[in-house]
Amino acid sequence: LLEDAEITVEEQLERLERRVEEFVACIRGLPDRQFLAKMNGWSPRDVVAHLIGWSTYTIEGCEEMRRGERPSYLSDWRVDFQNINAVSVQRFCSEDKQELLDELAASLEVLKQYLRSIPREEWASNPGVNYLGYRITVQNSIEGLTGDYAHHTRQVEEWVASLK
């Protein structure tokens, strides 16, 4: 997790945006049949739905942290967030690639607006919220989301390469 207290909110959002752009380009390049095909139990469509959900979960979690509460999504950590991810896959159920990518873009805009509203001094602060020995902050939560986009981009790219 990121512990660079000198990074600005805008620099971290730029990192997130780069990873999102890479992910979106990867998904856009998929034929519809691959977009809906299962890979490792999920389809690329499911991954997009999962990431749409995480924009909302991140906002909710940051609000909880700022109140000194543990983010509620962490209650699903031990099962690798399977329950909340399943909710997102069902909630964002379209099979239309462009529709889901538009929802992803909209969810990210809401997330970025929210993050820009957080005072800088709260970005890396920890109001006593720890989980499994880690300090949880807005900053490292966003770094985790950024890493999730990179992970899923690699996952889809490796899956596509394995089909050749």
Question: For the regions a protein language model found, what residue spans apply to each?
Answer:
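Short, contiguous alpha-helical
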Residues: 1-2, 34-83, 123-164
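Long, hydrophobic N-terminal alpha-helical segment
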Residues: 15-44
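Acidic/histidine-rich alpha-helical segments that form the ligand environment
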Residues: 83-124
